[in-house]
């Protein structure tokens, strides 16, 4: 089995040529093009197409050294379709992130400060995704290995339309839903692209995800080998930590004050 460092070294040699060719100037032009789409209130499908051809706009969410590809148009059975998805690795082990792209012309809140119909619909859809994963756990894990409690991202509306009162309501809403939903305006991608361009060094970008995202068919064919290695190593580490926790708990129980065994206890 490869180690994390070995997987990173191998990934570094696999940077997509389209990513290697990126320059700060090209990224500025890409960001301007995406901003024009937002300003023209382009259809969701147009935004999805652009993002599917410019994976680095997700660089603020996906670890730069992540081995997981970014997938688009992932179908959850015959019921739902997720705009984008990837497998995320953190201290708690691997878990999936699911993304819903909504209309840039939609408001986040009504004039009375309540979640708009567009935001309410998007949040319900995210909850439906999570419910589907739980109700079809075996099937879901065949498609997306390790999926259990996915975190759903919603991108909707524009930052300029968010009032101070809306901002406070959004903070509360995000806190209340933090275990299952994260909400951003579509301008989040603009900022992510800008930061990516500013971070391009003399050796070029270090973004290891293909420029053009993968598809449902790719996902059905299984995770790439390096991702499977990361999953296996993460599971091994978690099992080792779990065994250590169990041993510590047993030691604590066996050595609790007043509970030491005597010869007559044996």
Regions found by a protein language model. Give the residues of each.
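Charged, terminal alpha-helix-loop-beta segments
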Residues: 1-266
């Amino acid at each position: 089995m490869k180690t994390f460092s070995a997987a990173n070294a191998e990934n570094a040699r696999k940077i997509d040529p389209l990513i290697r060719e990126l320059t700060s100037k090209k990224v500025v032009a890409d960001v301007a093009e995406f901003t024009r789409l937002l300003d023209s209130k382009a259809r969701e499908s147009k935004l999805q197409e652009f993002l599917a051809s410019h994976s680095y706009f997700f660089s603020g969410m996906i670890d730069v050294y992540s081995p997981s590809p970014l997938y688009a148009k992932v179908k959850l059975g015959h019921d739902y379709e997720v705009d984008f998805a990837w497998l995320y690795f953190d201290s708690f082990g691997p878990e999936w992130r699911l993304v819903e792209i909504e209309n840039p012309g939609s408001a986040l809140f009504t004039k009375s400060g309540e979640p708009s119909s567009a935001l309410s619909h998007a949040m319900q859809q995210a909850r439906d995704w999570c419910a589907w994963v739980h109700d079809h756990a075996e099937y879901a894990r065949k498609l997306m290995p390790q999926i259990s409690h996915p975190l759903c991202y919603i991108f909707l509306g524009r930052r300029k339309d968010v009032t101070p009162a809306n901002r406070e309501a959004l903070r509360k809403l995000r806190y209340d839903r933090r275990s299952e939903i994260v909400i951003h305006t579509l301008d989040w991608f603009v900022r992510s692209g800008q930061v990516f361009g500013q971070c391009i060094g003399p050796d070029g970008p270090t973004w290891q995800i293909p420029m053009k995202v993968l598809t449902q068919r790719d996902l059905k064919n299984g995770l790439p080998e390096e991702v499977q290695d990361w999953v296996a190593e993460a599971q091994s580490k978690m099992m080792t930590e779990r065994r250590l926790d169990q041993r510590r708990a047993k030691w604590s129980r066996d050595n609790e004050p007043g509970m030491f065994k005597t010869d007559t206890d044996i």
